[in-house]
Amino acid sequence: MPEYRSKTSTHGRNMAGARALWRATGMRDGDFHKPIIAIANSFTQFVPGHVHLKDLGQLVAREIERVGGVAKEFDTIAVDDGIAMGHDGMLYSLPSREIIADSVEYMVNAHCADALVCISNCDKITPGMLMAALRLNIPTVFVSGGPMEAGKTKLAEHKLDLIDAMVIAADDSASDEKVAEFERSACPTCGSCSGMFTANSMNCLTEALGLSLPGNGTVVATHADREQLFLRAGRVAVELCHRWYGGEDPTALPRGIATFEAFENAMTLDIAMGGSTNTILHLLAAAQEGEVAFGMHDIDRLSKRVPQLCKVAPNTPKYHIEDVHRAGGIMAILGELARGGLLHTNAATVHARTLAEAIAQWDVTQTDDETVHTFYKAGPAGIPTQIAFSQATRWDSLDTDRSEGCIRDIAHAFSQEGGLAVLYGNIARDGCVVKTAGVDESIHVFEGTARVFESQDAAVKGILADEVVAGDVVVIRYEGPKGGPGMQEMLYPTSYLKSKGLGKQCALLTDGRFSGGTSGLSIGHASPEAAAGGAIGLVRDGDRILIDIPKRSINLLISDEELALRRAEQDAKGWKPVEVRPRKVTTALKAYALLATSADKGAVRDKALLDG
């Protein structure tokens, strides 16, 4: 049987000094034979999705100790993409994912922890911790801080979120008073932003991967029911320890749970719910850490056969994550996919022997268990607060309408092709991605004129100055992992196109990425990126670009000979922006850029460079 990793520092005469230090943290004689479980928290007052996490690590710790473990909490960093958006702060967002993964590895391995509870929530924190969990491969369970309640105001008929505040601010026809009202109403509580943006998408995907508990992605942060998820996570961590160290059960480990089949399940869910395009980047990165051969071609294959069963903001103003929960949450979507034969239901989870068992227990349309039905009735209270578990409001009924409700069955899908797609062509040899869930069907095939910008900042200025017109394809390049560096999100350009009335009349192509709040014909992750010799660096103003989502293609409409000639010219000049960009690239960012791969590899470090 495997021995506790912690015995390295808790057993033997030569570890007297280490035990002395452990005792100084509060450990006693009887604790040295128990599993030491690390709690990776991510509390910070900078991020609304994490502002309420301060005491939640200790909530988990007390439960771990109650059921026979030793708990040791630490914190990692968390960047708020919305606050970092639109300035050089966004250069740090994606690189922070690697720092988070490293910091969890450093703490867990330095102190020989036996298991791990990951308390995450927002955009790069869940992916960073997921990468660490698969890298470490010790018993791990995820529990997130939960989604924010959607905002409300008398000035709008629909619920609000961050994107509404950004779009209204760029609308010249909106009064200052209306902008202020949207600003004050859009983000009313603690939690990750209320739509199917990156944070909520990733927290939902941990359910499909089998690494978190039912409801992890959908119970609002303010609801008392989420407290039970934290307590149960503590108990599950100890159970996983017993299963691995006491029984050598491989399904107690992240790599025994998050297998190739589990990654297919997660991506299938992602496509079905129209998740953020960033999830593709993060799943590819996590797969590499877990040594799972899951890549862009697998995503492309799945995107052609998985229907879209759920449509949530920013893809529609009608529904937010709180509405997904009322409809049965992620387990309900997985249930519909399973009935369509689209899942590997024999995959393991941290809370059930198989995904099939989990669905049977938690899908509200399959079970009569009143406890489960009550759980999914947990709803928003509409009271602004930064306090977790502060309300216990419940809907009067569940949304089980699978023909016209928030979650659909396959026969009544929003679209028979899913919400995400991979496009290939001479402008993106290794692929690029688009959230089809947010693209109006009238522009699924779009031919337009290239309007090229060498940075996001230049594109924003051009859009606001009305230099972009209907029929243009806005090309923003040298914003990839290396070229940015840091692969900025392009939320401001897409929001400003909307506010200018061009959301359905223009396309945007970039080697950068998009916020989970983006909608419209926004195509990101063009690979290879311009800084790595990608053909997006060869596009010129006035070129024609053809985008064909049904055919999964994107092409620069010039001859192969012209493309080769341009490449030779660019090779001679060097692959860098034509214009000097007023951008401070620090040593930390240069270190990230030096090792970063393009988006089709998850923008992770190039291990070939490290291994020499």
UniProtKB/Swiss-Prot annotation:
Functions in the biosynthesis of branched-chain amino acids. Catalyzes the dehydration of (2R,3R)-2,3-dihydroxy-3-methylpentanoate (2,3-dihydroxy-3-methylvalerate) into 2-oxo-3-methylpentanoate (2-oxo-3-methylvalerate) and of (2R)-2,3-dihydroxy-3-methylbutanoate (2,3-dihydroxyisovalerate) into 2-oxo-3-methylbutanoate (2-oxoisovalerate), the penultimate precursor to L-isoleucine and L-valine, respectively. The active site is at residue 515. This is Dihydroxy-acid dehydratase. Pfam families: ILV_EDD_C (PF24877), ILVD_EDD_N (PF00920). GO terms for biological process: isoleucine biosynthetic process; L-valine biosynthetic process. Binds 1 [2Fe-2S] cluster per subunit. This cluster acts as a Lewis acid cofactor. Its EC number is 4.2.1.9. The keyword Signal does not apply. GO terms for cellular component: cytosol. The modification N6-carboxylysine is found at residue 124. It comes from Xanthomonas euvesicatoria pv. vesicatoria (strain 85-10) (Xanthomonas campestris pv. vesicatoria). It is an enzyme of class 4 (lyase). Pathway: Amino-acid biosynthesis; L-isoleucine biosynthesis; L-isoleucine from 2-oxobutanoate: step 3/4; Amino-acid biosynthesis; L-valine biosynthesis; L-valine from pyruvate: step 3/4. It catalyses: (2R)-2,3-dihydroxy-3-methylbutanoate = 3-methyl-2-oxobutanoate + H2O; (2R,3R)-2,3-dihydroxy-3-methylpentanoate = (S)-3-methyl-2-oxopentanoate + H2O. InterPro entries: Dihydro-acid_dehy_C, DihydroxyA_deHydtase, DiOHA_6PGluconate_deHydtase_CS, ILV_EDD_C, ILV_EDD_N, IlvD/EDD_N. GO terms for molecular function: 2 iron, 2 sulfur cluster binding; dihydroxy-acid dehydratase activity; magnesium ion binding. [2Fe-2S] cluster binds at residues 122, 193. Belongs to the IlvD/Edd family. Keywords: 2Fe-2S, Amino-acid biosynthesis, Branched-chain amino acid biosynthesis, Iron, Iron-sulfur, Lyase, Magnesium, Metal-binding. Mg(2+) binds at residues 81, 123-124, 489. Homodimer. Its cofactor is [2Fe-2S] cluster; Mg(2+). It comes from the Bacteria. The keyword Lyase applies.
